[in-house]
Regions:
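Residue-level recognition of well-ordered beta-strand positions that form the cores
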Residues: 11, 93-97, 109-111
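Glycine-rich phosphate-binding loops of NTPases
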Residues: 64-78, 102-154, 167-176
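Pre-Walker A-like glycine/lysine-rich segment at the N-terminus of P-loop NTPase domains
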Residues: 2-58, 178
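Conserved P-loop NTP-binding catalytic core
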Residues: 36-41, 50-105
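Short glycine-/polar-rich loops that comprise or flank the Walker A/P-loop
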Residues: 6, 87-92, 116-121, 150-153, ...
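A generic structural motif
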Residues: 13-15, 95-99, 103, 124-126
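Extended, Lys/Glu-rich alpha-helical coiled-coil stalks
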Residues: 159-187
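Conserved NTP-handling cores and scaffolds of large molecular machines
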Residues: 53, 57-61, 147-151, 181-186
Length: 187
């Protein structure tokens, strides 16, 4: 049985236009709805929030989708450090609950720091509030089991990405991604 997952919160620190610490609670405690819409004026950070979710979950793999071009991961990270922050460290922390037998709560914390031209990165995954070394070291495999990157972009998108998603060439990728989630393999 596969487990459902529900995002609880996202925390941004010196990420993009978000200077300092910003935490967004994604839990609908009243109606218990499963879809979160983020609205706002142009240039106010909606796309930044969506991109941060993909970056937090998929790291290096998300770079081309976020930027729209083959770009170095370190450049993407450098470009997303808040320009006016004195502290050149940045993090994205995404917390979600699994509807599994144990009601597991996972927090994925992707941190990076700029020192001169060098970018140092760290990934810490917590399970029920405790750092889990195994999950941290194997996160890229674990997250592909939860939501393969190929279909993640169909859940986290904005109007700027719709044309990318609707591209005719993407149809085969969509089929492959759906088969992957369903556990179907073609021989």
């Amino acid at each position: 049985r596969s487990a459902d997952m529900h995002f609880s919160s996202i925390e941004l620190y010196n990420y993009g236009i978000y200077k300092g610490l910003h935490k967004i609670d994604l839990v609908d405690r009243i109606d218990k709805k499963n879809i979160t819409l983020i609205g706002g004026m142009n240039g106010r950070g909606k796309t930044t929030i969506l991109d941060s979710i993909l970056l937090c979950l998929y790291g290096r793999k998300s770079a081309e989708y976020i930027t729209g071009k083959k770009e170095a991961y370190s450049k993407l990270l450098r470009d997303h450090i808040n320009k006016s922050a004195v502290d050149k460290s940045t993090h994205i922390k995404l917390t979600f609950q699994m509807d599994d037998d144990e009601d597991t709560v996972l927090s994925v914390n992707r941190l990076w720091n700029q020192s001169g031209n060098k970018i140092d990165t760290t990934l810490i995954v917590e399970k029920n509030g405790i750092a889990d070394l195994y999950l941290s070291e194997n996160w890229e495999y674990y997250v592909e089991e939860l939501i393969p990157f190929g279909i993640a972009k169909f859940f986290f998108f904005d109007n700027e990405k719709i044309s990318q998603i609707a591209d005719d060439d993407a149809f085969d990728k969509i089929k492959d991604s759906i088969k992957s989630v369903m556990g179907v393999t073609t021989i």
